[in-house]
From Swiss-Prot:
Function per UniProt: Component of the CENPA-NAC (nucleosome-associated) complex, a complex that plays a central role in assembly of kinetochore proteins, mitotic progression and chromosome segregation. The CENPA-NAC complex recruits the CENPA-CAD (nucleosome distal) complex and may be involved in incorporation of newly synthesized CENPA into centromeres. Required for chromosome congression and efficiently align the chromosomes on a metaphase plate.
Chain segments carrying region Disordered: 1-24
Keyword Isomerase: no
Ranges in a coiled coil: 28-186
Name the record gives this protein: Centromere protein H
Organism whose genome encodes this protein: Mus musculus
Organs and tissues of expression: Abundantly expressed in thymus, spleen, uterus, ovary, testis and muscle, and weakly expressed in small intestine, lung and stomach. Barely detectable expression in kidney, liver, skin and prostate gland. Not detected in brain, heart or adrenal gland. Also expressed weakly in various hematopoietic cell lines.
Similarity section: Belongs to the CENP-H/MCM16 family.
Gene name of the record: Cenph
Residue list for modification N-acetylmethionine: M1
Entry GO CC: inner kinetochore; kinetochore; nucleolus; nucleoplasm; nucleus
Length: 241
């Protein structure tokens, strides 16, 4: 009879060692992933610093450069969120591993206890029950954190899409302005402006001539509505039209 508790204890210890080995391997994989993410974040930040130093040498940033800079910043933020998520998972798994070890130890002690220790046994059962509830709550919390991370990623994607759209609009406006400037500075537009100024000058001379003729005729043009309208039209400055 004494050999059975000992065998159970040894089996529990072996199971605990096996779980510990699997958990350690999982932790090593997660730590490798964190190291990779940290290296990627450092490389991305370095690229951003180099990019900014190159841009600072210019007097003004182009919309394309601003867009690339914002994309790098969004990528850094995504990496930081992913690192925080991995760290949180490691902490959760470490706590779960500790509780598994404690559960195995408590179970072994309960099997070795006699009837006289029933009160302590009940306490241990209650502790194990609480541990299961805690682990369940932590799993639910982990799921909520994953959902929160997904929401953050979607928010970043929307922010990036909004910035990209605004930059596209700005690029289009700048292009239209450049096209207008090119048209205004083109030889055809210059020639048309010269012709227009010549026509304005000729028309102004004609206006003054008609005004002189009307005044020289000593006609009371104010009493004639049609003539009054003509005189008022002749007084307009064509350069302001």
């Amino acid at each position: 009879m004494e050999e059975q508790p000992r065998e159970r204890s040894e089996a529990g210890a072996e199971a605990c060692e096996e779980k510990r080995g699997l958990s350690q391997a999982a932790e090593e994989r997660i730590e490798d992933r964190i190291s990779l993410l940290l290296r990627l974040r450092a490389q991305t930040k370095q690229q951003l610093l180099e990019y900014k130093s190159m841009i600072d040498t210019n007097e003004e940033k182009t919309p394309e450069q601003i867009m690339q800079e914002k994309q790098i910043e969004v990528k850094i933020e995504e990496l930081e969120n992913e690192i925080e998520d991995v760290k949180s998972n490691i902490e959760m798994k470490s706590l779960a591993l500790s509780r598994m070890k404690l559960s195995v130890a408590l179970r072994d002690n309960m099997e070795n206890m006699g009837p006289e220790n029933c009160v302590l046994t009940d306490d241990m059962k209650h502790i194990l029950k609480l541990q299961k509830l805690i682990m369940k709550s932590q799993e639910e919390s982990s799921e909520l954190e994953k959902k929160l991370l997904d929401v953050r990623k979607k928010r970043l994607q929307l922010k990036q899409a909004s910035r990209s759209k605004l930059l596209e609009i700005q690029i289009e406006k700048n292009k239209q302005k450049e096209d207008v400037d090119k048209m205004e500075n083109s030889e055809m537009i210059k020639t048309m402006k010269k012709k227009l100024q010549t026509e304005i000058k000729i028309t102004t001379v004609v206006q003054h001539t008609f005004q002189g003729l009307i005044l020289a005729s000593k006609t009371n043009w104010a009493e004639d509505p049609a003539l009054r309208e003509t005189v008022l039209q002749l007084e307009k400055d064509l350069n302001t039209l």
